[in-house]
Amino acid sequence: MFIGAFIVVACFIGVLFIYDYFVPMAGHKPAALEKKGQEVVSSKKAATAPKQKIQDKTSANKTLAKSSTKTFKIPANTEIPRLKEKRQEQVIKHEGYTVSYNSEYRIANWVAYELTATEAKSKKTERSNKFVPDPQVKGSTAMNEDYTRSGYDRGHLAPAGDMKWSAKAMRESFYLSNICPQKPKLNRGIWKDLEEQCRLWALDNGSLLIVTGPVITGDMKRLGKNRVAIPKAFYKVLCYHTEKGYKGIGFLFENRDYKDNSLKSMAIPIDSVEKATGIDFFPSIPDDQENEMEAAVDWSRWSF
């Protein structure tokens, strides 16, 4: 009986000891576990910190790009020139270009249009190759038969290659009001090279204003039944807008066969083209900007 009482007392003391040891610890993590937990939290912060910095940097770049990108909207009809001397003309607006047609000579005084980067890279429609009289022309006009076996190409002023963005613009580029007699090696050579270069400049600068045409003189020879005038020379003047204003360049080509001439060697100030043609180019640009742009070629702005 004494032994039994002893066992009961011993068990009771053991229970009290276990209770005193474990119960106070129930609301606390072991020190080692608390430290590990802190390390895990710290590791997560360390992992997310670089990600946050990258996000911040990306946002900053987007903001910088947005603020440093400028879009220059050229006023409508800035490309339209003005004849300095009295000359017969009928101004006709087509989808892709505007033409000043001279019925006395059956050719244009000038053709003007804006070529955007979107238009320059478009391949929406194929070349037409259907040369037809311009239905809007009043008075005498050239006909296809005038060019037959003449030794001259039907040379585009506004090229078909610039009109691939619209089926209508493509068709209208083959109107004979947009065509002049050109020597084959001019039309298919350096003139074509300049047309292709213009598309590259339009892509580089977002938009390019183009005015092109024949140099009209009173002693031009004629061809065909309708006595279409044969120009002695052709011109093309170009302009685009930057954060520093307008930049312009001109070209003048004799109507002859060319071999190895480079485009850069044929480039001249727009003022020189104005003197040769009797045309005031880009007259709607403020005079101070126009005069600066046309006086000299800023070679740093034209890549060849």
Per-segment meaning from a language model:
Residues 1-304:
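Domain-level detector for secreted/extracellular nuclease and nuclease-toxin modules, and
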